[in-house]
Amino acid sequence: MLRLDQVSLTFNEGTMDEKNALQDVNIELESGEFLTVIGSNGAGKSTLMNVISGSAIPDTGNVFIDNKAVTPMQEYKRSQMIGRVFQDPMAGTAPSMTIEENLALAWARNKKRTLKPGVSKKRKNLFQEHLETLNLGLEDRLSAKVGLLSGGERQALSLLMATFTEPSILMLDEHTAALDPSRAELITNITDEIVKKFQLTTLMVTHNMQQALDLGTRLIMMDKGQIILDVAGEEKQNLTIEKLLNEFQRIRGEQMANDKAVLG
């Protein structure tokens, strides 16, 4: 599970560039819950992800993962509990290494180091079984350099690596935004399958409102560092893009930008 209690973070405090990135944010995710997060640029979505991952430390408030306070925990230690996929397909893999070597690194996370060299046949078979679920033919290309894969293939591999050890929290940071529409749809479908299969507690940030509506069990909308809308269950299922935009206007008394970056 994941919990944020009264989390606030201000950048450039006391200067002309002061910005309240997060303001008294409270979130509680139960085990297996899938939360999608939307909002325009500067709403606080990325800062929220960084505070959870540990790459940004809040000024006030606390972050809990599996009922353990992790706010003072260094990012590299916190990463043992978190799987994260970034927007850039190049960010989650080592391009100069093979598919097999990348998977071996992901597999070794949270496990005791041994002196055994290479990858055992049993583990190689396991890697192939996991790759088969992607339906991209990567199970037959274990020796291929990851740098030679397409963006969609690399992002699918990143997603697989992030979920290999079934992390306490899976964070998806606009992980389909850099892909063409067909590959974005593929990665979206793979995401849905993996999250449901392993019942992963998931937080997904997206600019694509339709994606936020189609995926997940709960949705929050952020604006100016605050959560201004939080819906789940039947209420979320009945939402449309038009209703979301109208709700933003009702809450904020202003019109949300109606551009491609927001509507996807």
Which residues fall in each region the model found?
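ABC ATPase NBD coupling module
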Residues: V70-G83, A91, R113-K116, S120, ...
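The feature captures the beta-strand-to-loop junction immediately N-terminal to the Walker
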Residues: I38-S40
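H-loop/switch region of ABC-family ATPase nucleotide-binding domains
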Residues: T206-H207
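Conserved beta-strand-loop-alpha-helix hinge in the C-terminal portion
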Residues: Q226-R252
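Conserved ABC transporter NBD signature motif
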Residues: G61-A69, L229-V231
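Helix-to-loop junction immediately C-terminal to a conserved catalytic motif
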Residues: S53
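ABC ATPase C-loop
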Residues: A162-T163
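A short, flexible loop at the N-terminus of ABC-type nucleotide-binding domains that lies
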Residues: M1, T10-D24, Q74
